[in-house]
C-alpha cells in the first residue's frame, strides 16, 4: 500500500509543478535604458531562440505580443535553468518552445510551429533529433 500512496503523491506533485512552475520570470535586457535588467514573464514567451549560426551570441525571447527581448546567456544556459519547467522543451539546436503557446503544427521533413499571437510560423522548429520527446510531451 505505501507504494501506491507514494505514486499518488508523486502524480499530485507533478501536476502541481505543471500548474505552478518553479521559475516564473527570466532576466532579460530591458527596453528602457534606465533599467539595469527587467524580468520577463515566462507565461508570455512563445519561444526562445539563438542566432549562433549567424555568429551572434544573443538569445531572443519572442512573446505573444510580438515583442522580442534579448539575453546575453547562451541557449544551453537558458535550457539548463528551465530544465525543470514543464512548459518549455528544446525542439532543435536553435529553439526552446513554450508548449502551452503552440496553436498549430505542420508535419514535413522538419516541423513548423504556429504560436499564439504570432501570424507567421517558426520554420523547422522541431527537428528529427528532438521529435520523439516533442511527440511524447503531446500525448
Regions found by a protein language model. Give the residues of each.
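Conserved binding/recognition cores within well-folded domains
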Residues: 4-117
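Charge-dense polyanion-binding interfaces
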Residues: 114-133
Amino acid at each position: 500500500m505505501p507504494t501506491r500512496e507514494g505514486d499518488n503523491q508523486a502524480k499530485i506533485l507533478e501536476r502541481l509543478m505543471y500548474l505552478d512552475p518553479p521559475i516564473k520570470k527570466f532576466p532579460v535586457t530591458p527596453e528602457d535604458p534606465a533599467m539595469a535588467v527587467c524580468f520577463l514573464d515566462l507565461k508570455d514567451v512563445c519561444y526562445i531562440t539563438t542566432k549562433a549560426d549567424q555568429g551572434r551570441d544573443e538569445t531572443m525571447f519572442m512573446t505573444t505580443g510580438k515583442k522580442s527581448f534579448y539575453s546575453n546567456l547562451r541557449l544551453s544556459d537558458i535550457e539548463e535553468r528551465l530544465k525543470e519547467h514543464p512548459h518549455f522543451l528544446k525542439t532543435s539546436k536553435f529553439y526552446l518552445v513554450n508548449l502551452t503557446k503552440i496553436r498549430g503544427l505542420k508535419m514535413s521533413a522538419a516541423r513548423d510551429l504556429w504560436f499564439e499571437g504570432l501570424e507567421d510560423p517558426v520554420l523547422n522548429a522541431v527537428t528529427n533529433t528532438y521529435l520523439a520527446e516533442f511527440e511524447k510531451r503531446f500525448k
